[in-house]
Every structure is written in structure tokens, then in C-alpha cells.
Amino acid sequence: MSTAMPGAFSPPRGLADLPLCPVYSRLGRPFHQPVAATSLPEPRMVHFNAALAGELGFGPEAGPQLLEILAGNRPWPGYASSASVYAGHQFGAWVPQLGDGRALLIAEVRTPARERVELQLKGAGPTPYSRGLDGRAVLRSSIREYLASEAMHALGVPTTRCLSLVASPQPVARETVESAAVVCRAAASFVRFGQFEYFAGRGQTEPMARLADHVIAEHFPHLQGHPERHAAWLGEVIERTARLIAQWQLLGFCHGVMNTDNFSVLGLTLDYGPFGFMDRFRWYHVCNHSDYEGRYAYRAQPEVGRWNCERLLQAVSPLLADAPGRAAEIGQDLLRRYASVYHRAVMRGWADKLGLREVRETDAGLIDEFLGLLQRGRGDFTRSFRLLGRIRTDSDAPARGVREAFADINAFDAWVADYRTRLRSEQNVDDEARAGRMNRVNPKYVLRNHLAQIAIDKAMLGDYSEVARLAELLRRPYDEQPDMEAYAAEPPDYMRNIEVSCSS
């Protein structure tokens, strides 16, 4: 039965008082078009993010009227929803027009912390950019996106957030018939590389400049008076992207669809589709079963990030200089930042994961040797790094309870000898303090694919308890949480290294 309230609609208490801040919406055409959401029959709240709701400035519970808004059955009070247009390179191939095919911007609000946040419904029905598709999302993929975005936030990775997950019995045809769902995503901005590519592909410099100036004014205000503001802004976008992908690598996270239309100009992890946290470490791990050539494999991600930044620079080159040759020179100078920023970020991150206070160039060999051990022995990425915190420098005894996790124990013991030597080379070695530091960067819990699948299977039967359990667990990924030990275990063999479909 629908939860729609009879008679006149009044906003949920507190929602009407939440100040709207319609900045992006005022850009109007050609950036986006007004689109109303398609009603979702019999909506049910699967999970509501009370913590994020508090940050946004309204209550910790979603009553029936708020549910209607988050299902797309009622508009946000005082705001007209819209869908944005963009283009992009998908698996390296240029696509001149894409766009929000099932996502609608439903509000821009000012939080109590004076931050502007955009709210977007994903799965809200068809838009002018749906390319003949139904504009819906399915429960399976929506659970994954909801849990992943909040898990990544708790891990300290820049990301879009999710406020709510709403399900419906409405059937949706994908590879099989599934049920519909809608997630409400939150971010400071959903502007993507592909929006600039769209206008570049049409030779429309004026709207591209307007969009760039909007992004700078709203999200990089310190650059507004800069004499070369567009170049300075692009430099910061490149650096944010490099640091973001370094964080992905350090967590064993594979995005799965690193198309330019899925890259945020704010350096946020955007669009959780066939993503995955690696179980057993493989340099060329591919999480998307549609990625036949491994374009977006784990090892390829840093270079893909650089390539995507190059496409952005190519698109906005008219904003850098009037002369194409000079614009290209500026772009190449900016692009060189990517490799150096990525290298510094990833080396600092690996050092932190090994408990090293200093970063030395010779540490690259130690890191590569450890990753080689994982690759050859099919070691679990997350669990192996967490176990390293147990190794002590005050003894040369075998690292019992750790070495057993490695297939080649002799090779591991040899590596540990080198590792202990490196740890002891730093002054004032304190094993307890080091273990504490390591446990703050090596998570115990990540959203493994098999855990998400268990929650999905239960939710499809109407049991949302596992979604709630995972949402709570993943809020504290670095804590021991002894009662949840089973969630840190490696997956059973039949659920290892699941590759996920793009179908969502």
C-alpha cells in the first residue's frame, strides 16, 4: 500500500525551514532541463542515513511525507528538479551526448554548517537523456551504491554520500526482472569532466566558460581573483584526482567504470556501479565483467586517471589561451603535476600502511616485494595489511598469527626480516604506537562483494536487516568491533573475486 498522505501535502517538519540555495539550477539551459520524477509505487524505506540527515539540518527519522519526497512522488518544497547533460569517453570511445538518464537534482540546500549541498535522486524515472531506457535503478545496485558511498566516506575517501534508499515492488527488466529502488545522493556538486567535454565537442566555448566560472565561484573561491584562474583551477582538479586514485589503490578499491563522465571536478568518487574491493590481491584484478580488455583493472587505474585529466584539459583548452599551441603547452605543464602528486600520495600512503614515519625512495622495493608476496600467494589484500600491525621489532621470532596467512611462509619470513630492519632504522621505535597508527589506515572492514550480496539477497525477500547491519558496521571500518569478527573474514571460495555487471 502506498504511503502517500491524503489531501493537501505539507512538508515534513523542519524540511520547509531548511534553506534552499539554488545556485546550479539558476544556470538553466543548456546545462540542464527541468524534469519531474516518475512516481514510484508502494515505496518502502530500506535505510535512512540519520547521521547525514543531521548534517543536512533535519531530523533523524524519515516520516511518511519525507519518504514520498525521497521516492520521487513529491517534489522538494520550492524546488524544480532537473537533469544535466554531458558527454564523455566510455572505455576510451567518444560519446558526444550522454546525460543524467535516471538521476534528477531535487534540491540544493544550505546546511547548518553553511555548506551548500546538492541532493539527487538516482532511479527517479526517464529524462531527455535516458536514450530510450526506463530511467529506473534496481534494488541490487542501489544497495551497493548506498553502502559503498557511506563506507568510502568512513574510510576517509572523498565521495558522494547517500541519504536514503527506497525500494518498491515495481518490476524492472534487466538481465532478469528485478525490483525498482531510488537512492538519494548528496554532494557539494555533481559536475563531471563530461560536462565540459559536451560543450567542447560542440565548439561552444561560452557555456563551457560559464560552467567553469560557476565551479570556481562555488567550490574554488580562493581562485576567483587569480590572473590565470582557469589554469589554476584545472591544476587543483588534476591534483585532487591524483590523490583520490592514490587512496583507491591503497584500499584495493576498483571503480570498474572510469569513464570521463564518471569523474568529478571536485575529486569525489562518483557513480558506484560494478565496483569492488579486492579480496585476493591481483595487480590486474578486474571487477566489471563487461571490461573484457581490463581497461579499468586495478593496476591501470592511476594511468586512466591521468588520461581522463588529459581529456578534460583538451576540452577546456580554449579557456587557457587564445592560441591553440600555447593552450596545449599550458595543458601539458598542468598534466605533469598528476604523476608527481600521485607518486607522493601513494608512497606516503604505503608508508603509513607499513607503519613507517618517514618516506624513503628505497621503500618502493619493500612495498613491491610485499605486494608480490600477496600476488604469488593469493593473499587477501585488506586482511594482510591489517595483520602487519602485529609484527614486533623487539624480537626476531617468527610472526606467528601473521605468517600463516601467507602461502609461502619462508618468503614471508625473509620479507619480515627486511621489514623489521627498516622499522628499526627509525628513531624511537614503539611497537604499540606504530600498531595504533597502522590500524587507523588499514581497515578491518570493507564492503566486500560477498557481504553486499548477502544483504541484497535478504533485501529481495523483504528483509532489510542486513543492510542496516552493514551500514552500522562500515561506519567504523578501522575499529575492531569484536562482535562483528565474521565480517572481516575472507569470502568463501565460491564468492571470491566476484565480477559485477554494469546492469543497474
Curated annotation (Swiss-Prot):
InterPro entries according to UniProt: SelO
EC number: 2.7.7.-, 2.7.7.108
The protein's required cofactors: Mg(2+); Mn(2+)
Keyword set, alphabetical order: ATP-binding, Magnesium, Manganese, Metal-binding, Nucleotide-binding, Nucleotidyltransferase, Transferase
Binding residue positions for ATP: G99, G101, R102, K122, D134, G135, R185, R192, D271
Active site: D261 (proton acceptor)
Transmembrane segments: none
Catalytic activity, reaction form: L-seryl-[protein] + ATP = 3-O-(5'-adenylyl)-L-seryl-[protein] + diphosphate; L-threonyl-[protein] + ATP = 3-O-(5'-adenylyl)-L-threonyl-[protein] + diphosphate; L-tyrosyl-[protein] + ATP = O-(5'-adenylyl)-L-tyrosyl-[protein] + diphosphate; L-histidyl-[protein] + UTP = N(tele)-(5'-uridylyl)-L-histidyl-[protein] + diphosphate
Domain of life, source organism: Bacteria
A Pfam family recorded for this sequence: SelO
Gene Ontology terms for molecular function: AMPylase activity; ATP binding; magnesium ion binding
Binding-site residues for Mg(2+), renumbered to this chain: N262, D271
Function: Nucleotidyltransferase involved in the post-translational modification of proteins. It can catalyze the addition of adenosine monophosphate (AMP) or uridine monophosphate (UMP) to a protein, resulting in modifications known as AMPylation and UMPylation.
Record NCBIfam families: PRK00029.1
Protein name: Protein nucleotidyltransferase YdiU
Source organism of the structure: Methylococcus capsulatus (strain ATCC 33009 / NCIMB 11132 / Bath)
Top-level taxonomy: Bacteria, Pseudomonadati, Pseudomonadota, Gammaproteobacteria, Methylococcales
Name of the gene: ydiU
